[in-house]
């Protein structure tokens, strides 16, 4: 007789038909809240409706219901993303010069939008080359399409339709998993299973399928394109997949199929899975064979990682065990209890994810120019500048969001009674030391970084250039940064002998790569000017961290307001009779942090824009002489504040200011309009609520006189609402102003 362990019972992890589908709720704005559902008495109602519509915590305290709402909303978000993506591909198919660009990417600009001839605005359709008139785009889609092997507009149409189908599918999934088969709380908390599926499925199989697409479709098509074959002559993607002989003509080892893989003779595949480093001199992008190799390697790593965690089979890691074992001699209970926090507080989970994703997005910004991944991306200066700026802004917002949700976690989900002597408790107990030290660092960095500039401005104003900090007077060379550059430049001979070139040309050592007479990339020299602005970066980032971290660590209590947790995440003041307690809520710290995030990112993108125009981007003559856009003026001019104002902001704003009457005039209008939006924000930020309430009451009096007063009583925005509207317009106005300034400049000179 065989003794077998009893079969594990299959756990039912969904509830069937938990909530009936009804459109009646749609007709009842605010149905999620008893107060808001009553309808408006005052105009504050519409603001509360918007503030609370997605604040699922305030609608129910049932964690399972909150989880289901968030899960369902994610499908809605994915649906919108697919819809947007479909629109991008449709524009490429219907309104773009993609096929013309593909035939001559160095002389023809990418355009996917043609303005209708109404009120004379067809002036905006500039000549992008090849006889096509339209708006030059800087999103990088053309370069991605070429890299993925798209050769005609029909393929773009098909992809656009495919994305629409997926958008519909996601909408359906959002409805289905809330109304028909809603997951139980246990399913959302099963982190090992989630890790396995996300690592092996999303990242592992996702990377593997992309690597497969690159090898079987992108590489052969790009090989033909680089050789100058007419796109119409190139076999279609499915022909490469179905007919191995076609691929074997380009890569002979394909004739052997999978034999080398199973006989461990992997070097046979080195034709299309390379380890070259550097850039392809034809396109100025990374070698696509390097990229395919990278995705294959990443896929293996994630497929292994997706089998590491313990689920039904009793082998593998358990996250709870890992966290609880993680303690050192000086950290008390270490990470004990963190598992419970992260499986019951989605704010804590989201906070970590936002912090990591934000940092990763900023890493992406820096890799897009130093290791340009797509063909002809590096020589499209407008796209390079846009991609860097875009990813920097996104990263900044995500990191502030991380602090916001960390603070919401502290206020709503943190239970101090169950936490003792773990890392979080220890950090909270010595928060005064952390914040006061951080404050000292900010003061030190602020005075010293700005002080170096003020010294230079003073010496420059007094006509004493020999006493300035610059490469030609008192040098402050960034020796550590230069050492890192050299280490990487020498890596192919030393630490990475398999590579022929270092990871990025920017490290130094290598020659420049030019495509079609334009510089793609070259070694980037760092000097005193970079040393100075680097310390401004350090200063602004530390101040942002100070504000955000103070908001998180003092979200529940402070010496000023010991019971802050009872007042909630956002509140204007600690009630009447408590002077000097306004603007101390966790929300207010996020509000202030946003301004410093804006400062930080602005300095970074200004530094990038000027540095690249001065020391990297430009044209190259037949004799090999490089002429940079601003002629290398960064090293001398950017060492004074006056230099930044005069030689960067003012000198480079001439294109946007003089754009009227040209195809760039839309940027001139946006520059003006965005300045106005920015200035409009100051009206909300620099005035008090009482002022507006008094004004409104006068206006209501006039309406009553004329018997046209509305039933809904007008009210001034609350203090928090006013600041929210203010910071929104400040950021949108500032970002749109910068966008217009950058693009008008780089499209005109790039």
UniProtKB/Swiss-Prot annotation:
InterPro entries the record matches: PSI_PsaA, PSI_PsaA/B, PSI_PsaA/B_CS, PSI_PsaA/B_sf
EC number: 1.97.1.12
Subcellular location per the Swiss-Prot or TrEMBL entry: Plastid, Chloroplast thylakoid membrane
Catalytic activity field: reduced [plastocyanin] + hnu + oxidized [2Fe-2S]-[ferredoxin] = oxidized [plastocyanin] + reduced [2Fe-2S]-[ferredoxin]
Gene Ontology process terms (BP): photosynthesis
PROSITE patterns per record: PHOTOSYSTEM_I_PSAAB
Protein residues bound to chlorophyll a': 675
Superkingdom of the source species: Eukaryota
Ligand binding (chlorophyll a): 683, 691
Membrane topology: Multi-pass membrane protein
Sequence similarity: Belongs to the PsaA/PsaB family.
Functional summary from the UniProt entry: PsaA and PsaB bind P700, the primary electron donor of photosystem I (PSI), as well as the electron acceptors A0, A1 and FX. PSI is a plastocyanin-ferredoxin oxidoreductase, converting photonic excitation into a charge separation, which transfers an electron from the donor P700 chlorophyll pair to the spectroscopically characterized acceptors A0, A1, FX, FA and FB in turn. Oxidized P700 is reduced on the lumenal side of the thylakoid membrane by plastocyanin.
Name the record gives this protein: Photosystem I P700 chlorophyll a apoprotein A1
